[in-house]
C-alpha cells in the first residue's frame, strides 16, 4: 500500500503543509477533519485536512500527524474549494481564510476541539399565536382592550390586527396565527404575551413548508411581477443577475419571492446586507415571511451563538435561509441555491484588514459560477464594475424603474450655499430653501432626514490669530472636535485630549471650531426648530448596538421628527413618514483622492434622496452645494444613472482604471519614515523590473499616510486587459518573497490588497 500524506491548513499565515498519515490513523483521517501536528521545536498545532494524496512532499524529514481531534468535518469539500480560491485570488493563505471563516470556539486549538462534539441542534420551529385563556370571551376581551387605551396604542393596534386576521368567528375558540404574519413588532407581541392577552406555542415546520405556502401568495405589483419573470428567464442563461431597481421599488419583495422558490426546492438561501444597521428592519420582514427558521449571522453575535449556527448549518442538508453581513459568505451552507447581495455597490462588502481582504460580493459571484448556486446582485445605484459586467453580457440584467404602490420618486432641488450665504439666507448651515421644507414637513406631521458626512461637532479647531490647529501626535491628522465633553479626538487611532481654551502655540486667542459635523447640526436644528424631536445616527452612536437600535426604532415609530446622520442613514432604510431629505454639504463627498469619488458621490446622493417619499407621499430632497453646476451632482439630482456611467466609463478607459484594468495595491508600514521610504522605493524598482515600468507606480503616500506612529506608503500595480492576472500575481509574490528575505528591509510590514475599494 502506498504511503498516504495529508495537506494541513494551519491557523497561521502559511500555505498548507504536508504530513504523513501513520497506519493507525489511515482509516480515520478524512478531508475536513481536525488533526494535531508537530511544527517547529516541540510545538503542536491543530489544523484541518484539506487534501489526502500519495505524492511524497519535498521535505527531508516528513513528520506524522499526531492524532485526530475532530472526526466530524469542520469544512466541506465545497468550503475548502472556496477557501483555496479566496487565498489564490486575494493573495493570502488558506490559514488566514480559515481564521476568518471559523467561529472562535471552532478555530483549531487544543482547548476547544471537543467543546461542541456532543451538541444536538434542532431545526427551527414556527411560533404560533392564539388568544390568551383569560380573555376568550367578548366581555373579557373588551375590558382588556379598553385597558390598553390610551397609553398602549401599539399593543391595542396589534390586538385588533390579530383579531382581524384570525377572524371574530374563530378567535375565541383558540384559533392560531403564525407570529410571522403579524405586522406588529416582536417587542409589542412579547408585551401582549406577558400581559396574558396572547399566548404562544411552537409547531415544528420546515422552512421549505413555509416557503411553499408563500409561492403564489406574495402580493407583487405589475412591474415587480415582470421583473420577477425576467429574473427567472435571465437565470436560465446566467448564473449571476444584476437587479437594478430604483429606491423604493420593492426589491425586497422580489428577493423574498426568489428565496421562497429556492427554499421550496429544499435548497438554501444566503441573504447578504452591507451593514448591521440594515438587519433589524430586514429581519422583521423576513421573519414575517419565513418564520423562526430564519438564521441571523453577524459579527455581534456571541462566540457561542456563532459556533452553534456554524455547526447547525454544517449538519443541515439544505433548506436554510441565512441573513448576514460580509462574513456570512463563509458559512457552511449545504445545497446552496441562491445568494442575494443587497446594496451590492456598498464598499462594506470588501474587507480591508486583516487578511483575507476579500469582497463578499465577488465571492458570491464565484460561488454562483463554481458551486451551482444562483446569485442576484441588487442596487438602485449598481457599482460600475457590476453594470459593465451586465452590459457586456457576463451577468443578466433586470431593470425595475418604478416605485412600489402609490409612491413617487422625490422631487430634487440643488441649493447653492454660496449664493444663500451672500443673500443672508443661511442659518445653522441650512439654506432657506431647506429650512422652509423642514418647517412645512413638521407642520404636516411628517419626518425629516438630514445628511452630513462628518461626525463630531466640527472637523477641527483653529486659532484665529496664528492658525494653529489640533493634530494627532501619532497620526498627524487634524483632531475632530466634540463639544460634548469638550474634547479633541482622532478618528483613526482613538487618541483623545481636552480641547484647549487658549491656543497652545500663541497663548493669545481661543481656538474656534471650523466646519460642521453631525453633533453641530443636531444642536443647530434643535435651536431652529425647538418643538421638533431631534436625534442623531452616526459612527459614534453606532458604537453601541443598543443605542443605535433605540435611535432607529424611535424614528421608525414616529417618536423622532428629525434624524441627523452620516452614511449610516443612506443604507436602505424604509421609513414611511419621511417627506424631506436634506444633504447639507455635497461638496465633501467629491473631495476624495480616489478614482471612484464621483461614482460614490452619485451613489450616496441617490441613496439618501431615496429615503424620501415612500408609500403615499412624493417627498422632497434638497442638495446643498457650492458647486451647483457639477455634472455628478446634477446627474444625481436627476437620478440619471446612465449618464453618470457613460462619463465614468469614458474616463476610466482613458486612464486605465476598473473595469478596463485590475488594480493591486501593496502597502508598506514602518515606524521609521526613512526606512519605509527606502524599502518602498526598492520594492517598486523590483516590481517594475519584473512586471514592467508602465504597470507599476512609484511608491507614494496614501490619503492617510501615518496612523499610530506608523508611516505608510503604497505601490499600485495595474493589470491591463489581455494580461494574465495570475502571472502578474506570481511576479508580485516573487518580489514580496525576495523583499522579506532582505535583512535590511524585512522588518517593514507589507500587505497586498487585490481590487481595493
List PLM regions with ranges:
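Accessory, non-ATPase domains that flank or precede helicase/AAA+ motor cores in DNA-metabolism machines
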Residues: 1-379, 391-407, 690, 716, ...
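A general secondary-structure signal for short beta-strands and their flanking turns/coil
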Residues: 3, 14, 618, 659-663, ...
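A short catalytic or substrate-binding loop motif that flags glycine-/basic-rich loops and adjacent residues
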Residues: 41, 455, 709
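A general secondary-structure junction signal
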Residues: 51-53, 102, 202-204, 452-454, ...
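Inter-lobe coupling/hinge segments of SF2-like helicase ATPases
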Residues: 215-221, 225, 237-677, 685, ...
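Short secondary-structure junctions
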Residues: 529-532, 687-696, 741-747
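C-terminal structured "cap/appendage" subdomains that terminate the fold
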Residues: 683-723, 728-735
